[in-house]
Structure formats: C-alpha cells, structure tokens
Amino acid sequence: MILVSDNQFLHLGALAAWHDRATEHDLYDVQQLSVENFRHPPELSPFLYFTHMTMERSCTQCHQRKVRCSKTLPCSACVRLGATCRFPTTDANAHRPRRVQKITITDRIAQLERSLTILANSAGPLQGPENPNVRDTSTTLLPEPPQSPNRAQEVLVPDGASTRYINETFLSQILDKERALYKVIGTPRETEEITSGLRPEGLLASSRRPTNWSNELELSRWQSAQLWQIYRNNVDPVVKILHLPTVEPLVYATMNGEGSDDCRALLFAIYFAAVTSLSEVDAANLLGRDRRSCLLDFQARIEKVVIDAACLDAPTMLSLQALAIYIPVPSLRNRTDFYYETCLRAHRTSRSGWIMNGVLIRAAQSIGLHRDGTHFHLTPFDAEVRRRLWWQIIVLDYRAAEDHGLAVHGFGSRSDTRLPLHVNDSDLSPELRILPGPRAKWTEMSLFLLTSEIAIAFQKVYHTTVDHTDNAQRLQTVQELTAYLESTYLCHCDTNIPIQKVAWLSTRSLLSKFEFFVYQLSLNNEQSQEAVSSAAERTLISACACLEQSMELQTDDLLRGFRWLFASYNQFHCLMYVLWHLCAQPTGPHVVRVWNIVDLVFNVTENDPTRPDPGPTWKVLQHLREKAAQRRGNVAMSPPTQAHGPSDERVPESRTAEQHSGQELEGTGDGFGDLLAPPLDPSSLTEWINLSENLGMYRFEP
C-alpha cells in the first residue's frame, strides 16, 4: 500500500498489475493526474478508486465468492463489503497469442507439404486408380537420397539478377528470421573491377581467335534472325531448354543491342548451336564465311561475355541456359579445334566436356535447381522452367560419362526436382497461377521426357546389385517402362513428321540398348552352356536393333536437320559386343544381319569427314573387326563339316585357327596383342563383361 493523500491509499499489487499492461500513453496520463482526478464512490473506501483502471480479470475476492466482478480498482463488490480488493498478478505466459499472419499460415502449409512429401517418399507409392496419361513426375525411379534433418532448413536468397541457395541449418534459420540480411549475404559487386583479373572463370576460357585474327564476323539483323529461326527448327526440338514465347522477345531485343551480358551470352550460344546444325555449304551461303571460322568467332564472344557477366560468381537462369547449350573448355585438340557441351558431341566426345558439365551442375546447384521450385514458393512458371534446365543438364551428364566408360552415380539421385510437364510452350506463361495437366497428345516436350524417363530408369537398374535373382526384376523394369512410354508418348507419334520420327527412332534405340544392358548382365549369371547361348543370342539381337535404329537416325534424309546431334551418339558398346560375338561365333542365324550393320557403321563413321572424331575407342573396334573378318575367312576356307556346330570335337580346330589369327595380329605391331585376343569360343562369351570393364584400364594412343 502506498499513500496518495489523506486516507487515500493505492494497493501496490493492483498498481503493479495495471502497470504491466499499461501503454506508454496510459503512463503519461497517470503522471498528469492529481488527487482530484480520483473519484470516491458513495461508500467511502480507504482505497483509491481509479475510473480509467479497468482490469482484464476478476479480483481474488469475487473469484472465490463466485460473483460477478466489475473489474475496476477497487471493484464495487469489495467496496460494498469493505474488503481489500486484490487482483492476481499478471502472468506473461497468459497473454493472448498474437493474431496469426497470412505469411505465417503460408509458411506452415509449405512446411506441412514438405513433411508429407518426405513421408510419402519413405512409405512408397500409394496405390490408386491408374491413368496412363498421368504419372508422378518426381524422380521415383531414382534411388531416394538419405533424408537429412536439415532438409527443411533451406532458403533461396535473392542476389541481384541471380539467387543463392543455402541449406546450412543455422545460417538458413537466421536468414529466414532476418530478411534484411539478404542484401548482406549477396555477391559483392562494388569490388568487381578491382578483382576482375583474378577471377577463376579464366580457367574455363580457351585461347580466343588466332593471333592474326582481324576479320570479326559482323552479322546483319537479317542474318541474326535467320540463325534464330534455324535454332528453332534444328536445335530447340531436340534440346528443349528454352521457353520460346518468353525468350524470343529477349533474343530480338539483344539483336538490337538492348540486352544484358546474360542475354548476349544466350544469344551467342544460340548462334553457335544454329551454325553447328548447318552443313558447310549452308553456313557459307548464309554467313559468307566457312563454318569453322564462324564457330571460332562465336566461341570467342561467348567466352568473353561469360567472364564479363560473372556467370559462375552469380549464375542466372539465362546464363545457365547459355552454358547448357555451350561450355568452352581449355583444350582445343580435335579435328575442328573446338567443342562444347550440348553441341560438344557434334565435334568431339571428350572427357573435358563431361568434366565441364560438372562445373555446370555445381553452378545449377548454387541457385537451387536441384531442389524443386515449390520449396521456395516460386511461381508455377518459374518452377517449370527450372525443371527443364536441371533435367537437361543431368541427362547430358549421364550421356557424357557413358562415352568414357565412367560409372555415373548421378547428381539426379540427390535431387527432388520433378520432371517437366508434358505440355507445349503455348500452355505456359508467367501469369499462370495453376499449371495445366499433362497433354494426352504429342507435345514439344515429348522427346525430352522420353529421353529423361529412360535415363532415370537406366540409372536405377545400373545401381542395383548384379546377381541372378535381380535379372528378372530388371527385365520387368524394362518391360514396364516400354509399356508406359508406348501408352503415354509413342502412341501419339506420327512417323511422317520428322521430329516425331526422331522421337520414335531414338526411343526404340534407347530401349533396345536398355535391353542389351540387362541381357548382357545375365551372361555373368548363367552357368549352363544352353543358358549362356540363349542369353548371348538375346543380347546380340538387342545390340543389332540398337545399332540399326541409331544408324537410321543418322542416314535418313528426312532427318538431316537433326543429324548434327545424333551423329555424335555412337553406340560403341553395342558395336563392340557384336564384333566380339562375331569373333566368338563366326557362323549362326544372325551373322548376315550383324555384318550388314557393322559394315554400315564403319562406312558412315570413316567416310564422312563432317563427323566428330570417334576417339581412341575406335582403334579397339577396328582391331575387333579385323579379328572377326579373319575368323569369317578361316571358317569360309574350312570344310563344311567343320564350319558349323559347337561339338567338342570341333572346338580344338576352331581354337587352333583362332590362335593362328591371333599370332598374325600380334605380329602387326599395333600394340594390342593378347589383350584383345583372348580365347574366343562359344563358351568364352562370359568373358565379354571382363573385356568391356577392363578396356577402360588401358590407354590406347591413336
């Protein structure tokens, strides 16, 4: 109790309770009050009655008596009784919670969606009504990555035109609470001019033009527009990275000199890819210069713009799209003295291209492309464009690694980015709030999705353990995938239309290769001679089908506009197997078919000067072809009774002829010797796996 004036006291607890809830304005009013401001009720009380002081809770006396309290200090009931009026002290934890903001509700819903996604993935796919045209576009065929407790703590920080993906737990929590720190963590730009000479992008740039280069290619706007149309016709249908309706205005604006560095990088990459798809004659007629010099000029411009735009320090969607079409590399040693990533395969399937694709993957991860855009509340359109770019990069990585016999464990297995929708570009726009459903017809994304679906399934099978019990499951995976692709995509293909025929042939070729891979694994598991022969025949048929469909892609005149890409997809693994089979079994029901496709592959590869350098693997294939031809000649000169049948009596003679031909090859001085000439008889087909695996351990100089 404190004395205010004569016979006027204020209960200390009540004042403290009011003070805890009082606003700054209330406290100011109290300071201005005098004793005259206090009103005494008719029943004079020794306690102060303050009319402005309204309590939120009933006093202790009224609460115990279960009567209504006026919640004034003192309350009317205590005044009538002459009792001391005490109010309970304020409990900070008893405050009414603040009103939940809309953004908080959105965050909670997003967190719930992520939790449900993780739960669904861990529990397996739910069984529901089947619809052949609807499929979960998440990477269900890839092995699920281990769930990290930090997965929910991630943020996409704006960084100028770029973004920065952060999933470190403590830092992401701070950034999520303090959005003002986004500017602090961004890439510093005020020191770019000072440090420009020390930036690491220079490592990626090859030598520019020759030292005596003085005639820079100057394109007219008509030539630029023609190159853009060539890109749309020859490149975009088979390399579906761009959303043409939104990119086209940027392309024409950049042609007129209005674009940023990122836009210029994309424009030069488009020029580069367009010229790559042209023949020597067509390039000279359009640009008035030979094709090689035009490509060197565009290469130099891309390298300069990539460094000026700091595409690795602050990658953007435009710059990554440009890099996905083209990546300069430090070594320029091949027929045409240059190569690049998507268009790289049109000149040389070099290991450096695969290595540089890893740089592109890291840049994509730095802006969170490996995480689906729904985690960051992006617009449906932005999330869909990111999916296209990410999966194009991943599929390229699979194919590039395969060129060099490298086991790809796959960045895709550590990603939850969904596959893009099966829609046309016209179905998407930045204004969309809800994405359309997949189309039950041919779309511009059909070829892209066909390739991606097969690549995902192949990675799943590739990483399963090799044992006999799994082979039936692998074959079932291939059969289910084939049925799904036929019912969803291939049934809408009209093979009279060039791009749809490309999709049909390339899909059939890849599925045959998938079957070849699965059957090939069974060669190591089968024990009996009959089982080995049966598996070898199935493997041979699949390899021939893959080669035949691949060669039709490269030789069909209707598909000439896409030959620049498919000429680089050399099915050397299948070719090596059929040559091995011809060495092991020079006779049989499929020999004529096998030799026809072998001769076609060698004629096209060796007699077309515009094709990329096949690399050192070609030396191995040439050696096996010579070996198979010698075996065929030996069989032709043998008596008919010795030319057929795998009986035990005839095997020693076959082995003797094989050894004789092997000795002749050893004397040629080609350096291969017994490495590529092991005992080749029907029972040695199981050694094919050992050869195909061990070839990567040796270095064959051209």
Curated annotation (Swiss-Prot):
Organism: Aspergillus flavus (strain ATCC 200026 / FGSC A1120 / IAM 13836 / NRRL 3357 / JCM 12722 / SRRC 167)
The protein's name: C6 transcription factor asaR
Keywords from the UniProt entry: DNA-binding, Metal-binding, Nucleus, Transcription, Transcription regulation, Zinc
Gene Ontology biological-process annotations: DNA-templated transcription; positive regulation of metabolic process
PANTHER family: UNCHARACTERIZED TRANSCRIPTIONAL REGULATORY PROTEIN (PTHR31001), ZN(II)2CYS6 TRANSCRIPTION FACTOR (EUROFUNG) (PTHR31001:SF57)
Matches recorded under InterPro entries: Sec_Metabolite_Reg, Transcription_factor_dom_fun, Zn2-C6_fun-type_DNA-bd_sf, Zn2Cys6_DnaBD
Biased composition (Basic and acidic residues): 646-663
UniProt note: phenotype after gene disruption: Abolishes the expression of all the 7 aspergillic acid biosynthesis cluster genes and reduces ferriaspergillin production.
Pathway: Secondary metabolite biosynthesis
Gene3D superfamilies assigned to the protein according to its UniProt record, in alphabetical order: Zn(2)-C6 fungal-type DNA-binding domain
GO cellular component, one term: nucleus
